[in-house]
Amino acid sequence: MRLYPLVWLFLAACTAWGYPSSPPVVNTVKGKVLGKYVNLEGFAQPVAVFLGIPFAKPPLGSLRFAPPQPAEPWNFVKNTTSYPPMCSQDAVGGQVLSELFTNRKENIPLQFSEDCLYLNVYTPADLTKNSRLPVMVWIHGGGLVVGGASTYDGQVLSAHENVVVVTIQYRLGIWGFFSTGDEHSQGNWGHLDQVAALHWVQDNIANFGGNPGSVTIFGESAGGFSVSALVLSPLAKNLFHRAISESGVVLTSALITTDSKPIANLIATLSGCKTTTSAVMVHCLRQKTEDELLETSLKLNLFKLDLLGNPKESYPFLPTVIDGVVLPKTPEEILAEKSFNTVPYIVGINKQEFGWIIPTLMGYPLSEGKLDQKTAKSLLWKSYPTLKISEKMIPVVAEKYFGGTDDPAKRKDLFQDLVADVMFGVPSVMVSRSHRDAGAPTFMYEFEYRPSFVSAMRPKTVIGDHGDELFSVFGSPFLKDGASEEETNLSKMVMKYWANFARNGNPNGGGLPHWPEYDQKEGYLKIGASTQAAQRLKDKEVAFWSELRAKEAAEEPSHWKHVEL
């Protein structure tokens, strides 16, 4: 009987420490959801976590290759305490990416389904009060073909910075981006899902303690690309108020096309569908089971370098399309016309974007640690679908990047710099300049740090690889073991910059190294073991590639100018 006082003491302590005695239940427009409280070491106030809230109807049957529809209402308390399935994708690729990028200590068991339009919410708010905290909506990466929301646990960012974190899912691969280039299957379904999730945030986030008038969208890689596309999209107007693109912007040409017909025909053919008309293709593909489409997907060899085929007929990505809806015109035209959502914007890259993870996943033969001139040029041509460097320009590019060395090891490093510049560095600076020139507050960063959590297979020389900043942004040192004080402080600093920006459109604040705005002086922040301002990120590279592309366009008028939209 003597236990009773202890039990009461425990319950009293729980309540005193802000740990409510019953789990959180929140009203959404469609029905009530039940979450759970998680306590983070060092924080009295727990974070309420809701996993797998539906923001659209399952995109099945006739809703495959169709815009997302509103979720059906429910009249019970929906249990949202377990991870939703990730969108259909190659399970091996999805698993690898999740294990490489997660900030969790333990890997979560992954499930995949075509029924995947769910989001997760992490809120530090006292749900009995009317809080209006800044909202940060995360769009995951994975080349628009793999990935999921639950890889990224939002509790640390939420607790440390007192913000509501929402992680969203969107259709991927064939399901998300199949486009016949006409009304039968316009494409960009994945982006329409992202817009639908932002509408859900506007309608519901206030009940989770969030302020729908202060929404920051942020994402990495294809997620950063998606953020950049939403900045340009009229559909997303007023659905967010600031944006952060980490290692990916809409000028990354591998992920965008004006002509989706060839890849649509390829998908239909690989699926055993006739390609006589768009309507026939779409009807046939809608009849396929999820597994059959997955089989087709695997045959496409997405995100792989094709060393054998004709580079002009290789499709390693299922890209976003200029559909006249999500993107009314090409990104270049929208940026030039300054007709986009001029919200405050952080754009950044990592020091070695093509350091290890991307070349490894894509199957680049770089493991020997050296490249001769002939192989380097051949790889540039084989990379045409990703880099879009014409055969004629390869000697010019090779001379510019490798001309000064005969050392095959150095040449390999320079080859990796070249690919990183084309895929990430140059497009990021060009987007930032356009944003700045349209009068919107713009901030740039370059991240250079090797997290302690990365794969042991990765060479020690790779510092600031693609995805390395994720461990800082999502507070890995507070969930995983083994981080140094330096790494822990770096994560605190990055979370503070990101959340300051979410709060007021400027990352600066007390105790942080000053981050200059990206203006005509082109000041930016180098983030790493020592964090300091610098100037003119990649300006020489941008000058070289701009001139080269202009020359290319003059000699060979780009076919997209004549494509009927």
Curated annotation (Swiss-Prot):
Keywords: Cytoplasm, Disulfide bond, Endoplasmic reticulum, Glycoprotein, Hydrolase, Lipid degradation, Lipid droplet, Lipid metabolism, Microsome, Serine esterase, Signal. Detected in liver, lung and testis, but not in kidney (at protein level). It is found in: Endoplasmic reticulum lumen; Cytoplasm, Cytosol; Lipid droplet; Microsome. Residues 1-18 form the signal peptide. Gene3D superfamilies: alpha/beta hydrolase. Its EC number is 3.1.1.1, 3.1.1.67. A motif (Prevents secretion from ER) lies at residues 562-565. One of its GO terms (biological process) is cholesterol metabolic process. GO terms for molecular function: all-trans-retinyl-palmitate hydrolase, all-trans-retinol forming activity; carboxylesterase activity; carboxylic ester hydrolase activity; fatty-acyl-ethyl-ester synthase activity; retinyl-palmitate esterase activity; sterol ester esterase activity; triacylglycerol lipase activity. PROSITE patterns: CARBOXYLESTERASE_B_1, CARBOXYLESTERASE_B_2. It catalyses: all-trans-retinyl hexadecanoate + H2O = all-trans-retinol + hexadecanoate + H(+); a carboxylic ester + H2O = an alcohol + a carboxylate + H(+); a long-chain fatty acyl ethyl ester + H2O = a long-chain fatty acid + ethanol + H(+). Glycans are attached at residues 79, 489. GO terms for cellular component: cytoplasm; cytosol; endoplasmic reticulum; endoplasmic reticulum lumen; intracellular membrane-bounded organelle; lipid droplet. Major lipase in white adipose tissue. Involved in the metabolism of xenobiotics and of natural substrates. Hydrolyzes triacylglycerols and monoacylglycerols, with a preference for monoacylglycerols. The susceptibility of the substrate increases with decreasing acyl chain length of the fatty acid moiety. Catalyzes the synthesis of fatty acid ethyl esters. Hydrolyzes retinyl esters. Homotrimer. This is Carboxylesterase 1D. It comes from Rattus norvegicus (Rat).
